[in-house]
Amino acid sequence: MAKLALIEREKKRARLAQKYAPKRAELKAIIDDASKSDEERYAARLELQQLPRNANPTRKRNRCAITGRPRGTFRKFGLARNKIREIAFRGEIPGLTKASW
């Protein structure tokens, strides 16, 4: 199981990304707008750089909701592959069955 601090750090990153999403979108729209002057676009770029680093959604890592495992996590369930297997065998995920062909 991952350390609790790592799990909390990811939660903090998710909160920051959500908090600053409108501001980031506004600044990025100004930067991409060719009709704006170069000074306005440059000022928007500087302001974007001043936002917290963890406000960038690309820094967020998907982790298992149970164990905090960073790899092998399925987005659909929010769980790591080994936990999905355990829970599915117990029949706790509706509609999920073991493949057989």
Curated annotation (Swiss-Prot):
HAMAP family on file: Ribosomal_uS14_1
Subunit structure as annotated in this protein's UniProt entry: Part of the 30S ribosomal subunit. Contacts proteins S3 and S10.
Protein name: Small ribosomal subunit protein uS14
Gene3D superfamilies assigned: 1.10.287.1480
Superkingdom of origin organism: Bacteria
InterPro entries: Ribosomal_uS14, Ribosomal_uS14_bac/plastid
CC annotations in GO: cytoplasm; small ribosomal subunit
Family listed: Belongs to the universal ribosomal protein uS14 family.
Pfam families named among the record's database cross-references: Ribosomal_S14
BP GO terms, sorted: translation
